[in-house]
């Protein structure tokens, strides 16, 4: 039995071989490799002669090159990526000599194809790559600078060259058997440690035993000069990928599951804190604006409420930071990087800053007042229209008014809550199918699904909530300009009326905004109303359309009607033609009756042409059914072809049966005595065939 990558030195005087054994991890432990119907025997060292030195060197060189590209263990890099066609199970690799192996399999060539089917690591690793994409192939490229020098190769390609092994042995570099992904802390990120897995340890022990066998075989043919490289084995430092084991895959899935659960919990707490702060803000704004029980902005009740709003805002900002940190760790788990700065992109930083600012706006204690310009239109003045002029005046308005309006921007957390609690995101099968089809389960996907499944409920709920929020914001902006002219009930009623009319893109001019903020709210409401109106029209148009089955029924009935009218028009043309012929042949009726039949004949021709035109237009308008008809014809043709094949096979079997019966009858007829009452001559074969 001969191992690859061994060095043979032939001495011409003694005709002996000098073998230099180099350590390796044997993936094939059998001396005979079976591939297909061809059995290849590896040449033994004892059978080599002096004339076969060149052939032996070529053989060992080819085996060294093939084993150099052979994978040692299951690696993320050697797994098939999502972009490949067959990504369910790893494909077998064939080297130049016909040996079969798999990058995920530790078995020999004879058992490689069957062992991988029952290997749970193969299935789990393939599914993991299908969900996380091809970024895992470049895992070592995402490592930190300080760790790149200590990381062994990921693709686990073995370098059996003399220069590589001698250099490593001379320098005394410690042995590395490949890093294995382990998870020390499931609450944080993954850490890569250079530990010896049980599989690699088993391979190392088998390689040592195999090396002893090779040394014994080499000693039988000559002296042995062996390098002490079994304990200082180094793989080619390609820094590409990281080998993984089944425990690492389970830990990765566990970390990912925990991070997804933490994201949902953080979002829930963030929404609760945001709603709590908004409720406190609403209570404080209403009691201070209406001066209930003499409570003003400087009262201790108002200050206490704003302190509660500030505390809830601080807690909300803390949860926003936790949410983005959790997303960064989740991205680290997905891509395999060990430095958090790799996944922190510009888009993520901008998103975090926008969310932090939106959630950080709130009414603060002792915020003070500011000057706000109110524009009093001429409609609110008495007297002749010529004397009415637009006047502006500055009014002291609390800063909490504008802060309270911007505080409602944190309502975007409800959209995130809706996405994370949707059945599309909660269902693992739906999320897996979406990942395999490169579809992200985000806010856009959930909104489109809701509009497709329950459009009326979604639009009604959104319109009602939007109407209430915009009405309250309009009241906050306009309530300080009336200075007690109208009671608060009339103010809220006018606000609801104004927002509803503006939302429906109507304007009667009875209520107009007095502040620039109110005008901005009116413009925003008009734009949103236009968008919602267009969506509502599209939904109604889709609902009033006929289904495909209903259209098929109507098309069939209309087609039958056109066919009947076509036959009737053709019959009328023939009928009036016969009448004209009878009038021309006979003398009864005169020219008056002839002209009557001729006019009817022309009318029948025009009717026939119009029916033909309608049939042509109907066939053109229903051209979309042609693919269905083509598919139906193809299916019918396939079924008929299958039936014909069955008939041909049955006919052949009947012919074989007939021939067998004929042969049996021909051989058994001379030995059968003639029955009484029958002819004494044997039945001819052609008569038997006809009778049969």
Curated annotation (Swiss-Prot):
It is found in: Membrane. InterPro entries: CaM-bd_dom, CaM-bd_dom_sf, K_chnl_Ca-activ_SK, K_chnl_dom. GO terms for molecular function: calmodulin binding; small conductance calcium-activated potassium channel activity. Residues 667-683 have a biased composition (Polar residues). One of its GO terms (biological process) is potassium ion transmembrane transport. It is a multi-pass membrane protein. Keywords: Ion channel, Ion transport, Membrane, Transmembrane, Transmembrane helix, Transport. Heterooligomer. Belongs to the potassium channel KCNN family. SK subfamily. Forms a voltage-independent potassium channel activated by intracellular calcium. This is Small conductance calcium-activated potassium channel-like protein 3.
